[in-house]
Amino acid sequence: SMGESECEGRDRMMRLYNFAKENIPGFENAAMLGAAEQMGIRQTRMLQGEYVVTKDDVKSRRHFETSVCRGRDYYTPYGALLPKAIDNLIVAGRHYSVESDAQKMSREIPPCQAQGEAAGIAVALALNSDQALREVDYKAIQKQMRAQGADPGDEPSANALCENNIAAE
């Protein structure tokens, strides 16, 4: 249960704190100022989207033509924001469509913010053109992201894995 997990977490924290005070030079006078009131959940259920980003996609820096935002060196295709079985819903941040191991590598705050920006643009475009979210042209999202000063990942970095350099391998 959450309560048991929180107790175990606090117990581990105190053991580490005491170990550091007793065994690591410079920590003798350390003081614990506090800890989080509640345990944070980093990962739960994963969305099944039109595309599921894989660990290999993130590690290999796979570029997608339909990319609507970019992390450090990885790209998020528009389909990873669109749930497979639900129309007119878009998801951004740590809940986008991604494998568990890939999510651990790609849930940083800046790309989550960029996904949110892309999702907001997609919704605005859908509303303004009376379209379903699946019908929104990813190129229009990319164009608006660029106009707002964001990197939609439409231009692959020099170290990106692109379809044209996959064929060359």
Locate each region found by the language model.
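Mobile, glycine/GP-rich and aromatic-enriched active-site lid/loop segments adjacent to catalytic centers
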Residues: S1-A102
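Structural signal for hydrophobic packing residues in well-ordered secondary-structure cores
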Residues: Y17-I24, V123, L127, G149
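Non-catalytic terminal regions with compositionally biased, polar/charged low complexity
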Residues: L127-E169
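Internal hydrophobic alpha-helix adjacent to the cofactor/substrate pocket in enzyme cavities
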Residues: Q113-D130
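Short, conserved micro-motifs enriched in small and acidic residues
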Residues: G3, C7, S106-A114
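Short, surface-exposed, polar/charged, turn-prone segments marking secondary-structure boundaries
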Residues: K59-R62, E117-I121, E163
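Composition- and surface-driven signal marking solvent-exposed, interaction-prone regions
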Residues: M2, A102-R107, D130-Y138
